Amino acid sequence: MKNQNSLRYIFALFFLSFAAHCQYIFPDVLVKFKPLVQEAIFTGTGSPTWDEQIRERGYILKEKDGYHMWYTGYTKNDPVKHLGYATSKDGIQWKRHASNPINPQQWIEDVFVIKKGSKYYMFAEGKGDTTHLLVSANKTDWKALGNIRIKKTNGQPIEKGAFGTPCVIAVKGLYYLFYERDDLGIWLAKSKNLIDWVNVQDQPVLNKGPEPYDLYGVAMNQVIYYQGYYYGYYHATAYKDWREWSSNVAVSKDLIHWTKYPQNPIIGNNQSSNIIVPAQQGFRLYTMHSQVHVYQSN
């Protein structure tokens, strides 16, 4: 009996320690969210316009003058995916840009935007799920810079095929790119100039599975730095046919070794392509596919 009590005590200590560690590396402000608005705050028009429907990851930047959103619109009558732009004072009520779609001749979806100096750089998927780079001085007129180039650690180009859902973070003078290949895993590359990239390693830094919620596909949407850790917000699917996706989070100290949140997914109900935006208190979480919903951290 004494031995059994000792084992129970040891297991209790282990689980308490594990729970405390999870609370430390996954603070509630980054993983616990409640709806700020119950219904979707931005959707496709539902009528035969260029943005009858929206899809994939859009991106939101919060600046001094308000919120700026880039999104992908499409219609059943046109296979090309187009870029839209909208603005908001509060991040909830959005106004579409009068000249949408912007850059109407280019296939643009799954966008990610960073600001470097006075210019904005957009990473986006083109036709065939390959990533290309664009630059703008005013957020609406974008100049194409061509496909980014990714090499393996041995200097050879990565194998032909998809390299999409680009996600970029700047760290100590370098840029780090997370990308997926047919949602089979998430790879990491680095660059000094945003166009030429070299893999940090040739294997994924975040794999799908083994848990059911991300068993059949993963893609990184955004990585932020918070109190000594990197937090990666990614979407995933538990279904082989990809019929439904969820929003999830993982943590890392070095961008290479990741620990998934034990209570993933943080948002279900087929709300995915999740991004984080700072708020007056805590953070907002926006899920961008296939309607935009907004959540507030607890």
Give the location of each predicted region.
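Bacterial N-terminal signal peptides that target proteins for export
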Residues: 2-10
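Hydrophobic h-region of N-terminal signal peptides that target proteins for export
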Residues: 13-21
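N-terminal hydrophobic alpha-helix used for membrane targeting or insertion
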Residues: 10-12, 79
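Carbohydrate-active catalytic/glycan-binding domains of CAZyme proteins
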Residues: 23-298
